[in-house]
């Protein structure tokens, strides 16, 4: 494929995704004009409209996070607490209360089933793209959707997720709140008629604000939005500042309504040096193994269980809820997000949340229960979300990683009691390490878990486990829409074509110097026709008496001259030549060469010396240009920097 064809096809492609325009009412048009004028006046030179809009997006994302949590707390209070008499352990931000199991048994089956049914009816009736965990929809909108999210999707996603989680579904909050924030960012960008690239950035800024607020992790939220797009250690660096601005405002807005206390309270822990690293490396191995199982179960249930079932899509989440209820009859801990169970079972309760006969920060679950819950959570999360239910995967991943880390910590503590290992430290590191592997977001995981716990003393083991798990699990991911790197993103392909070609010089490409058709300027037309008939060339180079390049002509010029047969005997090569000659020098970049090839509409272009436009060096064929581009792209994907031209 010729790159110019690719460019022409790729540049307007984002416009094809603008299937949904903003409302055309007079009020919306007027609002758009007002905001456009304000944004234009306040835009900082060099920063642009995205910088001005990001705080506004963060404000709405923060309010969305507050509304989401309030609605979820209300549903949990009336359904799980009131109807099922099910009280989970409090998280670090909660208040002490007794822990109870749900009853009666038939309601444990009925409530998640009805929740799945209601969620499925809402989603598949009004916004089918809101099914699942939501983050993939955000990633897809960035890479392939031009930053477009339908206006109804955030609302439908939020309502359906509140119902799913509030009725016991095993799902988290990051997917819904990311879509709520991203949806407003996309809407505002459409309202202001921003470019596709600006729309993508505002969409990410909205996601960052929502995630940063709801998890009390503003830096982690900003990193998440930039990092979750790619499978490798890459991130959308252009979005970092907008995401930071949005996350700061969203977190501050959230703090006006809900005290931003740490979600987990951990004891004073310290990393004691090199001797502990092998122990945490074992945790990374465990995280990689369970992470592989988690991804296989998650998509295996979708592809081989729920898809083949001959039921309407609206009904399948109810089936997932019923199956979850069957497991919850024996293990109610797998219902909802379950952060409180991680605090109580794997870390231990702080003094402020202790129940009678409990010791401070003493994990209340043994190795067997912790491992059982970690494995069962992989199944129940798949039953909830892979059936078409609505909710995120970060919460369940934190649950699985925390339980797995707590189990590994207790096991190692029992094997090596003299080392005085802290199982709570392994639980905290397991949360971040596990999510880093399944989501391919190591920096996010390190910062998010540290901020959620308000503790940065375990940064070194967190870095180790996240890094090792990333390396061990590079072949699978929980987010199907991720691409390996920006080079592979449709959102950046046009940029990379231009950027890569601008990095390469004509001197780095094979220029043909033999077999050229040099035609003296005074050559008669009859001789020209004879030479053309015997040649396989398509571009003919006209030279003067000194051998300097003075023009070029093509087969089309010959055909045009033949139409005026009465003048043909008087025509010489100099009459056919195009002037001024479009050439490139050895010092020109390949992007310049591509543009001139396109202007001439030919396969080859003359290459001349940099200091003498008449001194012909050879011909550059577009085939060699494409080959150089392909080689450079492959080199950029290669881990060996020496392979880059």
Locations of regions flagged by a protein language model:
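Tandem CBS (Bateman) regulatory domains
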Residues: 482-515, 529-533, 549, 554-605, ...
